């Protein structure tokens, strides 16, 4: 009997518990919103408004497109809220596909996420960060790549500390990013009196094909809210909390995008907006001079940082889910309970990202190569 009890106690002490080695509810609702908003609001909002304005050719339809983008995203978010509350899992889309179509199909999706989609997105955003930081501090002929490598390593190290550190950094970066967009909106309303002319609303109607093209740009800018599924098992409050988190994120995104576009119309006019290649920079420069343009560069760099960190958080969880289900990738299926993070998933992700950045060094345009790689 003594031998049996000793063996049982030894087995208990040496076998990791399910709590220690699986995701637990450590994320606050605010942190979860910061992750979702941080993924969605990237550099796109600084570029796509001019493209949408040029395609629609009307201020009214421009705003309709952005509002409709919010409604479509909301509809999708409601579907994901149902999935995330019914099947909360670190695998997110991978887990949903596995339940619907089997693990073979879901493996292809998760493998693409792990090796191309997430890692390629991180690499291209790292080059965006590097390009903007090089304007402030040039580190030589490979400055952009050096900055890109540095940011991948730095954010990976922060995430290795644990979910508390990474979520705190994510919240801070998202606040700075949103503040920057609010500053852009203020600049637009500040110079609205100097705008060429008040844009006419619904004076012309774009063709169905052109409006559809505008919606492509809009939905591209809204893209990423579905990543909420990857953190659904880690939000405090469980199933009751994830629905408000997703809905609040979409509401915040829609309000910010509408506010920014209204401000751009007020400050630049429809024609100025449609012809601008850097709408936010032009607006900030017009409102505050060279100082405004330099400040915007900092906010764009922060936007890239925000998206990189958020993508790292959800991407590592894809690696973890793969490791849990596939014996050949078992080394990635370890969850560090004390840190609340898939440490090995982060390390694999970082290695692939760094390899992509280093590959980009030897290309004419590292950013362009990463765009083609992820397309």
Question: What is the role of each PLM region?
Answer:
Residues 5-50, 54-60, 73-74, 78-81, ...:
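Membrane-interface "cap" regions at the ends of multi-pass membrane proteins
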Residues 18-23, 63, 137-143, 171-298:
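Helix-loop-helix junctions that connect adjacent transmembrane segments
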Residues 31-39, 118-120, 340-349:
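Select subsegments of transmembrane alpha-helices in polytopic membrane proteins
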Residues 33, 62-67, 107-108, 125, ...:
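Hydrophobic alpha-helical transmembrane segments
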Residues 51-54, 74-152, 157-160, 165, ...:
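Hydrophobic transmembrane alpha-helices that form the core helical bundles
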Residues 57-59, 86-90, 99-105, 233-241, ...:
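Juxtamembrane helix-boundary/capping and inter-helix hinge elements in multi-pass membrane proteins
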Residues 65-68, 136-163, 178-185, 346-355:
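Transmembrane alpha-helical segments of multi-pass small-molecule transport proteins
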Residues 95-96, 102, 134-139, 245-312, ...:
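TM-loop-TM module centered on a large, flexible mid-protein loop between adjacent transmembrane helices
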């Amino acid at each position: 009997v003594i031998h049996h009890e000793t063996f049982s106690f030894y087995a208990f002490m040496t076998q990791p518990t399910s709590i220690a080695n699986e995701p637990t509810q450590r994320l606050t609702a605010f942190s979860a919103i910061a992750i979702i908003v941080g993924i969605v609001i990237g550099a796109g909002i600084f570029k796509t408004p001019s493209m949408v304005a040029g395609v629609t050719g009307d201020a009214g339809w421009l705003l309709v497109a952005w509002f409709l983008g919010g409604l479509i995203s909301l509809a999708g978010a409601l579907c994901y809220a149902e999935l995330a509350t019914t099947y909360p899992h670190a695998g997110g889309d991978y887990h949903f596909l596995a339940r619907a179509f089997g693990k073979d199909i879901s493996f292809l999706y998760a493998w693409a996420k792990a090796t191309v989609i997430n890692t390629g997105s991180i690499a291209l955003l790292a080059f965006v960060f590097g390009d903007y930081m090089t304007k402030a501090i040039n580190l030589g002929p490979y400055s952009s790549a050096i900055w890109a490598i540095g940011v991948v390593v730095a954010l990976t190290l922060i995430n290795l500390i644990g979910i508390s550190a990474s979520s705190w950094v994510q919240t801070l970066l998202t606040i700075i990013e949103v503040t920057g967009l609010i500053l852009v909106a203020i600049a637009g309303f500040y110079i609205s009196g100097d705008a060429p002319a008040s844009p006419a609303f619904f004076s012309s109607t774009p063709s169905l094909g052109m409006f559809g093209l505008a919606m492509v740009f809009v939905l591209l800018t809204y893209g990423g809210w579905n990543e909420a599924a990857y953190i659904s098992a880690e939000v405090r409050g469980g199933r009751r909390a994830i629905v408000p988190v997703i809905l609040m994120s979409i509401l915040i995104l829609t309000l910010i995008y509408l506010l920014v576009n209204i401000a751009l119309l007020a400050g630049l006019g429809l024609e100025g907006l449609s012809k601008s290649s850097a709408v936010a920079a032009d607006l900030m420069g017009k409102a505050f001079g060279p100082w405004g343009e330099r400040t915007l560069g900092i906010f764009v760099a922060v936007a890239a940082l925000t998206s990189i960190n958020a993508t790292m958080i959800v991407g590592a969880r894809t690696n973890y889910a793969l490791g849990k289900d596939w014996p050949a990738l078992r080394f990635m299926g370890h969850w560090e309970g004390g840190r609340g993070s898939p440490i090995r998933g982060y390390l694999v992700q970082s290695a692939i990202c760094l390899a992509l950045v280093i590959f980009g060094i030897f290309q004419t345009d590292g950013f362009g190569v990463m765009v083609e790689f992820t397309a």
